């Protein structure tokens, strides 16, 4: 199947968890994966394009593109949407980031190959290509999947928010 998937995202890290490795993003995964993700580190917030071959067998994630992001103080009504008693206010967030994957498939029957080219945009109009097309491989039980994730390395249930405004699939 050939299709394009585009989504509008905003990353809202937990201000009490600075430098604790929060991650959230947009992913295509199967036995391997590629993702556009937001990451917090001791050096700030970054947008990264990553891929991982042999992910199901513990493969290493490679960072293919990285750019720093500025966090902007959110307005009060929006901040209150993400209010949690023990998290200091106000919240800060990235600007809106648009992510896109163009998936192309070729072949017939059991001999189909697919690839996904990832892009991002800061305005929803001009998209920047990220790396080379990613070879999409099916998962263990079903085909490859498109989705979102939000996680961090420490064990606590107060991670960042990934605000998904919308997702659109087109032919």
Locate each region found by the language model.
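Extracellular glycan-recognition regions
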Residues: 1-171
């Amino acid at each position: 199947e050939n299709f394009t998937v585009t989504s509008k995202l905003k990353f809202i890290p937990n201000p009490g968890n600075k430098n604790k490795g929060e991650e959230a993003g947009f992913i295509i995964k199967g036995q391997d994966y590629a993702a556009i993700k937001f990451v917090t580190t001791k050096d700030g917030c970054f947008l990264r394009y990553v891929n991982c071959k042999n992910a199901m067998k513990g493969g290493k994630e490679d960072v293919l593109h990285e750019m720093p992001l500025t966090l902007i103080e959110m307005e009060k009504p929006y901040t209150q949407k993400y209010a949690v008693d023990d998290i200091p206010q106000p919240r800060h967030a990235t600007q809106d980031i648009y992510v896109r994957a163009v998936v192309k498939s070729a072949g017939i029957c059991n001999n189909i190959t697919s690839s996904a080219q990832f892009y991002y945009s800061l305005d929803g109009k001009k998209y920047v290509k990220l790396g080379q097309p990613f070879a999409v491989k099916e998962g263990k039980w079903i085909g490859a999947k498109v989705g979102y994730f939000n996680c961090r390395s420490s064990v606590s249930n107060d991670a960042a928010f990934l605000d998904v405004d919308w997702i659109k699939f087109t032919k």
